[in-house]
A protein has these predicted regions:
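Generic structural signal for small/hydrophobic residues in well-ordered secondary structure
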Residues: 2-3, 28, 67, 98, ...
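A short, conserved alpha-helix in the catalytic core of glycosyltransferases
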Residues: 58-75, 79-112
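Active-site donor/metal-binding and catalytic loop motifs
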Residues: 106-128, 141
Length: 207
């Protein structure tokens, strides 16, 4: 549970009660109250009955209840989250590995949450956090694609994004938009580091 998540009165109780009822699950999650940005994904579109628990392919990492016993039986090395990923897509990676083991992931509609996201960050640190977010998103996206689809696929997917980021970086430099230029510079830098198999080393400067 991330610190930028707000709970409703029965969020935890309903989630735990449903976990006891379901039993046969690897991961379950509460449901976001923001329907425009759901905290789950389903590969094959289908009608969803929001009055009962439903199975999904992936849930966002800011609220997950893991069936530790089942997960440990699946991953003998006891590595749940990929520790090479500092930020972004670690939940996608875990969910993908869970589904590859034919295990189940559920959303519990009676357990609601509100995700604040960037709104949970102090204005004093907003710029540094935004730069960090852009760096790590680019790094993690390439790493995830490389891990699950291969280096060449990740490269073909990443090179156009690298070119786009560099063009935007130079454009914003020319028109003296300093912060915007830094954003796209960090996007490019995160991607380049991932392409070169370097670690996700970047950290925001919030001293």
């Amino acid at each position: 549970l991330n610190p930028d998540v707000l709970l409703f009165k029965d969020t935890i109780d309903n989630l735990i009660n449903e976990a006891k009822q379901l039993r046969n699950f690897a991961i379950i999650s509460s449901i976001s109250d923001n329907k425009e940005f759901p905290n789950f994904s389903i590969k094959k579109k289908r009608h969803i009955d929001y009055k009962k628990n439903f199975e999904v392919d992936c849930v966002d990492g800011y609220c997950m209840l893991i069936n530790k016993k089942k997960i440990k039986s699946m991953f003998k090395d006891n590595i749940f989250f990929d520790e090479k990923i500092f930020m972004y897509l670690e939940n996608d990676d875990l969910c993908k590995r869970v589904k590859e083991q034919n295990e189940k992931i559920f959303i519990v509609p009676t357990s609601k949450i509100k995700h604040l996201g960037a709104r949970g960050v102090s204005n004093n640190f907003h710029s540094e956090v935004e730069l960090s977010r852009n760096w790590h998103w680019s790094w993690s996206k390439f790493y995830y694609s490389k891990k699950h689809k291969g280096y060449l696929y990740a490269l073909a997917e990443g090179l156009p994004k690298l070119v786009s980021s560099m063009i935007k970086f130079f454009f914003y430099c020319i028109i003296f938009k300093k912060f915007k230029s830094k954003v796209y510079y960090n996007r490019a830098l995160g991607l380049i580091n991932s392409m070169l198999n370097r670690s996700s080393w970047y950290r925001p400067k919030i001293d």
